[in-house]
Amino acid sequence: MVRKGRRKEFGKFTKKIAAVGLALAMTVSTAIPTYAYYGFSGEFTRSERLTQTRVTSIFSENELGVVNFETTWGDKKANIASMDEYIEEADKKGVKVLVFPEMCVTGYVSSSDPTSTEYKWAVESAETKDGETASHFAKIADEDDMWIIYGATETIEKDGKIDKNHAYNSAFVCSPDGDVTTYQKITPVEGSWCTSGDTPVIVDAGEYGKLGISICYDTYSTPELERYYSAMGCNILINPTATGGGWSQSNMSAWEEYYKVRLESIASRDGFLILSSDLVGMNETPSNPSKFPGGSIIMNAVFNGPSYLAGADDDSNIITNQEGLLTNSKSVRASTGSTCSNEDFNPELYVDLYSELADKMEENGGVLRYSANTTASTKGPKAAVVNMTGYWGNKTKTIAKMKEYIEEAGKKGVDILVFPETVLTGYGYLQPSQDPFYQKFGVSMQVYTAETIPGTTTNELSKYAKKYNMYIIFGMTEKDEAGTIKDNGVEKVYNSAAILYPDGRIDSYQKIHRAGQENKWSVTGKTPKIIETKWGKIGVDICRDGHFYPELGRYYAAMGCTMFIHPTATTGNAWYRSTRIGSYVDRDGMAAITCNLLGGDGIYVADGAYTYSPDDIDENGDFVGGSAIPETIYNQNEIEDDPYWNSKNWLGTGGVFNSTSFIATKGSTASTALKPRINYNGTGAYSEGFEERGNTSPLGLEIADMDLTGTGFGGTESTFKPALYAKLYDKLATLYRGGYVSKIKDKDNSGTTPETTIPETTTAKDSATKTTEPKNTENKKVATTTVTVNKTLVKKATKVKASAKTKIYVKKVVGAAKYQVQVSATKNFKKVLATKTSTKATFTIKNSKLKNKKVLYVRVKVAKKVNNKLVYSKWSASKKVVINKK
């Protein structure tokens, strides 16, 4: 019995981080966990979780638009004229939010040669946000009462100077009030002409929600940005993009895989409605012309699959090589996702992880680049996953079953064997009134059956790891070796992965992000786990860690892991599994071994009689009650109406697990190779008989020879910015974790350390949603400030001609910072025709927006600044307005 180092106190130390793209240097004073956390006992505590902002918007058919746009390279005038035509078309269809592609005004440029025509054009064509082009589109946005977002190169004056040798790749956001906000691409891959931005931009679009702005590579390869947007309450992700131009037209299937895996995993994980607008057709640069595929989409996704509202066929295949405006085909609800407001979302930890990566990157000269240890004879390990469930509360029977699979794997030369999450004891949680362990011992089954690691079971199975020179990883519940852990007076344990080494060492990883009812019996771990092997480093996480929290996987990849191991217990289908876990393979260069429970889990009651009691726990502490589980278990659908696969016959939160495990490696990354980007090695959804089994993996072992060629993370100062990410997570922790003290301080030129400076979020319009009144929910301990409003604020509209505009005058309110007016065709405002925000008490609305209604209803609210924040009043009483047309 050998175990990795005992508990170590994490000493505090000061770290210097290179501020990438930021004007000020940063220092971080923090405790970075280096070793697994052990020796903890007593009361489990952590910072208070404060309420986070969430919004919901509902869009009718055709209110959202994206454009497959073909540029005339180097001709801004022609491109602007073409954009005007699309805007007019969108306005006629009733579009409220319209997105054009990246660099659509100029044509796409990728160059690091300052003498080239392309490089010079990118810089010379750049304009400020109040330049001629932005002013042109801002005026149209105001007239059409539409959000217009487009891509162009931008120049920004800093310290009274303009850089004449570089420019930004920016998204210009024009509001319905004629305001312009710009976002500068944070991770540009366009060459040295392009300066990196360093500030996320959140646009408060009023009734349409909160828009997070991201450009192309920012979206596909920077999950940290999307996480920040989601945590800050965004419900829509805007993605002007120029993707696919470097791919061979003969290999569009690989580009589509890249595009779909990246976007669908984001939408499903973070809850966004995504508007992605891509270039289409030829981009005729002088030296390197390329053809873009289009593929603009409007899409959201849930637990079981994507929903394409534009840009894809009925089977969710991306439609390519078609120019034109696309709008949402049906009404859609856009709501802020819940993952980044979950109690286990852990920005405090992420600050530490990314700060450590920033140090490492600085030490390596601004680069983090890795590859696996492969040779001509050994491309990687022979890996196996075990598709099974344990016997609920009966470790004796489960261990016997596990040994059979270990023996089989050993005889087949397996190097790494992975079992599912909590396989040793079973996953399902039962309420105390149903749990026989609770009734007999006063604790849940998961707590009673937990062991220390090393402990009885790990010591026993470690012998097999040594015998077969094999790594064995399996899920179990873990006690703290120092004593009992209490959470609000309830005894709890860790949800852990036991790690058995070929040399006899025993270690474990404790799950950091829990799922479902796991908080009833477990506490969160605190420390990542990296295994050193002859093939390279391997990171370990469990279920929700990998499915919902990319921060841990990104840490592993950037620390040099070329593989990660992922025991899980999920009912998510094959699409959910492949997009979530496949994204690490494709984006971060880590091969994946992910093993899911397969079969029934919980107390089996196939005969319909819940005949079990505390007396069904034998002298060994094993549960032996319930219906008898068949000695031979068949694959799903192998026997008609098999009661074993009926979830109604299982008690507990587990039920029936019938999804997939798989072993995934990098496929082809070459743009011309006709191969998939992710190779599932004949496992999971690519296993023989997958559809016949009802889209599940086969019971038992799935084995694959892993080829680690092409694995490994690659990040440069332009494409991976851990110092910035640490700063963003620090802001989130400061906002939403009670008692958290910022770990990041900016230094001014004098060397003093003032209050933390956070990249500012740009707001172009003040918040409201279609379904709820805006509330100050940033901190539940702060009372909402009320601004009163006069019910007679709305004056009569002017008499106008049918073809003209309607002017609405509002009585001025002393101290008002902004006014917002809404016009509706109905008194209950269920049919809102227009919403306008202004600092002035006068509003102008095109009659076309008012649907030529003769009778309208108008209401207003005002905002005052309270503690530097805009706080809105409630809506005034509505006023009926009759428009007399001349």
Annotate each PLM feature.
Residues 804-815:
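Conserved aromatic anchor
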Residues 126-147, 220-319, 323-326, 451-471, ...:
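CN hydrolase (nitrilase-like) catalytic-core segments centered on the catalytic cysteine
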Residues 850-868:
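Beta-strand-rich modules
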Residues 746-787:
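Ser/Thr/Gly/Pro-rich low-complexity, disordered linker/stalk segments of secreted
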Residues 76, 85-176, 244-265, 269-272, ...:
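Cys-nucleophile CN-hydrolase/nitrilase-fold catalytic domain and related Cys-dependent amidase chemistry
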Residues 867-885:
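Extracellular fibronectin type III
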Residues 28-43:
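Sec-dependent signal peptide cleavage junction
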Residues 126, 139, 155-265, 320-327, ...:
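Active-site catalytic loop in hydrolytic enzyme cores
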